[in-house]
Each structure stands twice: as structure tokens, then as C-alpha cells.
Design a protein with these regions (language model features):
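Q-loop/switch helix immediately C-terminal to the Walker
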Residues: 35-49
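Catalytic Walker B motif of ABC-type/P-loop ATPase nucleotide-binding domains
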Residues: 110-113
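Helical segment within the ABC ATPase nucleotide-binding domain
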Residues: 125-138
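ABC ATPase nucleotide-binding domains
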Residues: 177-208
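ABC ATPase C-loop
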Residues: 102-103
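ABC ATPase NBD Q-loop/coupling interface
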Residues: 1-16, 58, 173-175
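Helix N-cap at the start of a conserved alpha-helix in ABC-type nucleotide-binding domains
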Residues: 121-123
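H-loop/switch region of ABC-family ATPase nucleotide-binding domains
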Residues: 146-147
Length: 208
């Protein structure tokens, strides 16, 4: 696995985490529930440091101010709850916080593993809009896994479809811009030799 010209295939996880941000489908996986919002953000902020004791250093006033300002951008009122344990937050709030933590120090690549799939529609849309805003403003290279075909065509600048671990379709540019969800599913059927039968994918086809 090459990232920015460097082979990271066998790098230790704590080394890779300095340059790779990630969000899981489960909003409970990206944060430490028994630690406060402030403490979770401090861990994320300090993950790129070379000091072995950095994670245990005292959170400075300047850092707290920065955390508060960044939380305010989420428009969820979390900036006024920095001393509360993350375990008290809703799934959507935790996922938004995880997104913020993953991009506090701009990563070389952001991996999104169906990060809105477990959220209710309204919350999912809010988190997705936050994602688009942060990725655009920080110019982050992003790889997003989704079963939603509308999202697969609407977001980013390239769509890849996989079957049994293999890439069977790769579209971008003008071809992608003109492609509808029906076109995408038809192309997949031609390349993979079979139609999609995943209920989640077929349900997303009739949305919007």
C-alpha cells in the first residue's frame, strides 16, 4: 500500500494514524466514552507529536480555546459541553466529533467507512454536509465507502465499484458527470456479469 510515495503496508498502526484519518460505520468506535469531549480532542490533536509523554501532558488554555472554536463549527452546542463524557452524546454527535478529531491535524488521506449508515436520515445528512465542508476546505484526499448509489455519483470526482474484492468499474470525468444511478447499475451488471441484489443498494436507488 503506497501513500504519497511511501510504502505503509507494514507500518504499525500508531505510525499510520499520524497521516490517516478514519471514521467507522459504528459512531461509538471513534471516541473514548469515559473521557470528556475535551480529552478526546486533546488525544486527537496530539497524535502527530513525537513526544512519548504528549498524550499525558496538561491541556493548555490555548488548546481549549481552539477546541471550543472548532466544536462551535459543528453547530451542535458541544462547545458548551467540553467537560462532559463523550458517552453521554448521541450517535450523531459522536460521529460529528469523530470527524472533527480525524481532521484536526489535516491527514494525507481520510477514510470513511459508511460513516453515516447507522444514523437517522436527518443526522446522516448533517454529518455528510459537515464532511463535504471539511474535506473541501482542507483539500483532503478522501476515500468513502458507501452503499448509497446517489452518494457514489454525487460526491467526490471518481466512483469505483467492487465485487468479491475486485474493482469492476472505475468512472470519472465527463462520463461520471453524465451517469445516472440506472446507468451505474447497468455498467456494474455488464462488468461483473451479474446484477446487484443488495437490498440497501436497491433501496438507495429509489431514494431522492
Amino acid at each position: 500500500i503506497m501513500l504519497d510515495g511511501e510504502d505503509i503496508t507494514y507500518q504499525k498502526e500508531h505510525v499510520r494514524s499520524k497521516v490517516i484519518g478514519h471514521l467507522f460505520q459504528d459512531p461509538l468506535k471513534g471516541t473514548a466514552p469515559h473521557m470528556t469531549i475535551e480529552e478526546n480532542m486533546a488525544l486527537a490533536y496530539l497524535r502527530t507529536t513525537t513526544s512519548k509523554n504528549a498524550y499525558f501532558s496538561r491541556i493548555k488554555a490555548a488548546d481549549k480555546k481552539k477546541f471550543r472554536e472548532q466544536l462551535a463549527l459543528l453547530d451542535m452546542g458541544l462547545e458548551d459541553r467540553m467537560k462532559q463524557p463523550v458517552g453521554l452524546l448521541s450517535g450523531g454527535q459522536r460521529q460529528a466529533l469523530t470527524l472533527l478529531m480525524a481532521t484536526m491535524v489535516t491527514p494525507k488521506i481520510l477514510l470513511l467507512d459508511e460513516h453515516t449508515a447507522a444514523l437517522d436520515p436527518a443526522t446522516a445528512e448533517k454529518v455528510l454536509n459537515l464532511t463535504k465542508k471539511i474535506v473541501s476546505e482542507q483539500n483532503i484526499t478522501c476515500l468513502m465507502v458507501t452503499h448509497n448509489m446517489h452518494q457514489a455519483l454525487e460526491l467526490g470526482n471518481r466512483t469505483l465499484m467492487m465485487d468479491s474484492g475486485n474493482i469492476v468499474l472505475d468512472v470519472s470525468g465527463e462520463e461520471r458527470e453524465k451517469m445516472s444511478v440506472d446507468d451505474l447499475l447497468e455498467q456494474f451488471a455488464v462488468r461483473a456479469g451479474k446484477a446487484l441484489d443488495n437490498d440497501r443498494i436497491l433501496f438507495s436507488k429509489v431514494e431522492a
